[in-house]
């Protein structure tokens, strides 16, 4: 037995790198500051949540940045262990295993502070010019009202252009994800410009949930999904998830963030 021990230790030493590599989760992702970005040390709010959830389950994570469409296609083909982070859709539920909710995006209405925007229902916005990004889903009700002519919209290329239109008074209201707005204002506008804008505390919808996608054909996908969901539950129950979600600074004087919601309790988002 004494002679077998050195051989056993040698074999274990050879196996250890492969065993460690098997615990590393390779994740395809893209740029969407502040949620997913190479410009932040933590790689963004959403990716930090993904990293910490896997870490609590004993996995190391490596993120690989690429165009979003490529990330989804290559993950579907099984070239990556997972892709983060994505909205739910019927097609993605057919193509992938979807995790529990990573985070609920906070879509709110930004306006010039001087107009003192108040609203209870979308119909209340009928007298304002609303900036919209054509490729965004928003909500089915929102688009029904637009098609019925009950909301006035102005097409714009992206969120940054929408914020600039607000300051130029070319639009009155911009639906935008709260943390995306905060990040853009911090990086592209002066404090004086940001101070001209207000955000209404009411959420446009509470169902913009986002998820980790895993290819169902890979042998370990089901185990990784279970491990991730377990780690995510720990992250939420410990309060760390909520702390990560508040890591983006917003302009002074903005309305308080909406009350935290249980990410597992909301419905699906339709777009990434």
Which stretches of residues belong to each language-model region?
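Extracytoplasmic small-molecule ligand-binding "clamshell" domains
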Residues: 22-95, 238, 247-251
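Short loop->beta-strand "edge-of-pocket" segments that line small-molecule binding or catalytic clefts
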Residues: 24-38, 121-138, 233
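Periplasmic-binding protein-like
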Residues: 29-31, 104-108, 191-229, 251-259
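Extended ligand-binding regions for polar small-molecule ligands
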Residues: 47-56, 210-244
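Ligand-binding cleft/hinge of the Venus flytrap
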Residues: 48-59, 100-101, 124-126, 135-157, ...
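Acidic, polar ligand-binding/catalytic clefts
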Residues: 51, 64-124, 135-138, 201-205
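Short helices/loops that flank or line small-molecule/ion binding pockets
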Residues: 69-80, 97, 160-183, 187
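Ligand-binding clefts/hinges and TM-proximal coupling segments of bilobed small-molecule sensing domains
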Residues: 137-151, 193, 229-272
């Amino acid at each position: 037995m004494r002679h077998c021990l050195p051989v056993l230790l040698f074999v274990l030493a050879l196996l250890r790198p492969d065993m460690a590599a098997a615990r590393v989760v390779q994740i395809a992702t893209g740029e969407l500051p502040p949620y997913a970005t190479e410009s932040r040390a933590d790689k963004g709010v959403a990716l930090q949540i993904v990293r910490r959830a896997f870490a609590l389950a004993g996995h190391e994570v490596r993120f690989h940045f690429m165009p979003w469409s490529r990330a989804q296609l290559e993950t579907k083909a099984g070239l990556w262990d997972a892709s983060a982070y994505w909205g739910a859709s019927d097609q993605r539920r057919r193509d992938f295993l979807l995790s529990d909710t990573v985070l609920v995006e906070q879509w709110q209405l930004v306006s010039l502070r001087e107009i003192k925007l108040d609203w209870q229902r979308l119909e209340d916005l009928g007298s304002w010019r609303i900036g919209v990004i054509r490729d965004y889903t928003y909500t089915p009700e929102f688009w029904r009202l637009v098609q019925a002519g009950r909301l006035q919209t102005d097409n714009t290329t992206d969120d940054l252009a929408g914020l600039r239109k607000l300051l130029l008074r070319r639009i009155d209201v911009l639906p935008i994800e709260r943390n995306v707005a905060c990040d853009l204002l911090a990086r592209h506008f002066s404090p004086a410009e940001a101070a001209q804008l207000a955000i209404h505390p009411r959420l446009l919808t509470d169902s913009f949930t986002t998820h980790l996608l895993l290819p169902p054909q890979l042998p370990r996908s089901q185990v990784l999904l279970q491990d991730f969901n377990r780690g995510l539950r720990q992250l939420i129950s410990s309060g760390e998830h909520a702390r990560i979600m508040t890591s983006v600074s917003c302009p002074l004087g903005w309305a308080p963030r909406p009350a935290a919601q249980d990410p597992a309790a909301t419905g699906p988002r339709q777009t990434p």
